[in-house]
């Protein structure tokens, strides 16, 4: 079984874990409706990059 030879300092421990953080999702604002949505995803009402790309139940 592997056993460390020397204790890892708090600084080295932090450097080792430097990329283990959680990233908040990138959000965009839809220009036509002003709704917030995740990047590269359609908004809840069916708009993507200013165009209607999906029919929703509320559409006539």
From Swiss-Prot:
What are the GO cellular component annotations? large ribosomal subunit
Basic residues bias located where? 49-60
Write the record's keywords in alphabetical order, separated by commas: Ribonucleoprotein, Ribosomal protein
Q: Which residue ranges does the record annotate as region Disordered?
A: 1-60
Q: Does the keyword Ribonucleoprotein apply?
A: yes
Tell me any Pfam family this protein matches.
Ribosomal_L32p
Report if keyword Ribonucleoprotein is assigned: yes
Extract the GO molecular function terms from the UniProt entry: structural constituent of ribosome
GO biological processes: translation
HAMAP family in UniProt: Ribosomal_bL32 (MF_00340)
* Protein family according to the UniProt entry: Belongs to the bacterial ribosomal protein bL32 family.
Question: What name is this protein filed under?
Answer: Large ribosomal subunit protein bL32
Species of provenance: Janthinobacterium sp. (strain Marseille) (Minibacterium massiliensis)
Its gene?
Answer: rpmF
């Amino acid at each position: 079984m592997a056993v460390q030879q020397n204790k890892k300092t708090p600084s080295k421990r932090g450097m080792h874990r430097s990329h283990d953080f959680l990233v908040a999702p990138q959000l965009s604002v839809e220009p036509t409706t002003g709704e917030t949505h995740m990047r590269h995803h359609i908004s809840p009402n069916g708009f993507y990059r200013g165009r209607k790309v999906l029919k929703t139940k509320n559409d006539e």
